[in-house]
Amino acid sequence: TMKLDYIYHSGFAIEADGITVIIDYYKDSSEEAPDRGIVHDHLLKKPGTLYVLSSHFHPDHFNRDILSWKEQRSDIRYIFSKDILKHRRATAEDAVYINKGDVYEDENIRIEAFGSTDVGISFLIDLQGVRLFHAGDLNNWHWSEESTPQEIRKAEGDFLAEIKNLQQKAPRVDIAMF
């Protein structure tokens, strides 16, 4: 069985048999305290391999606190967008870094990096027969009241180009997180 948990903002967790994946952790689900909520109260204590993915360096998608989780978990694997390293939010030893087009694969999971219309990457995840897509900051970014018609057309074209690329390489996606 597999369970999808919404954490906060763009943060999600996937709970599968013996595997947990946390994506774009910004803060935990509880408003009471920063170290309370589904991540600290449940997911970090759950047995099995823990994967932590971050799509880019913006603080609402990457919280450096996640690097301290390795003190509690010897079975943690970090997979980050290369812009996190470039912007010195983490060191080369902290994670495996991937760019658009790169694939991370081990005995449990396959993660392919797709593009973004902002910075960083989006993730296509194959896990226990389920294909999931996490968009990161891939979006049709424009604001009607601020953007010119030309900016709106460009934003929409960029977004649709990334979606078309995803569709060509992965015609089936079971769960999408935007």
Where do the model's predicted regions map?
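N-terminal pre-catalytic "stem/leader" segment of glycosyltransferase-like enzymes
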Residues: 2-16
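Pre-active-site segment of Zn-dependent metallo-hydrolases
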Residues: 13-53, 64-69, 138-170
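Active-site-proximal beta-strand elements of phosphoester/diester hydrolases
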Residues: 3-6, 21-24, 110-116, 131-137, ...
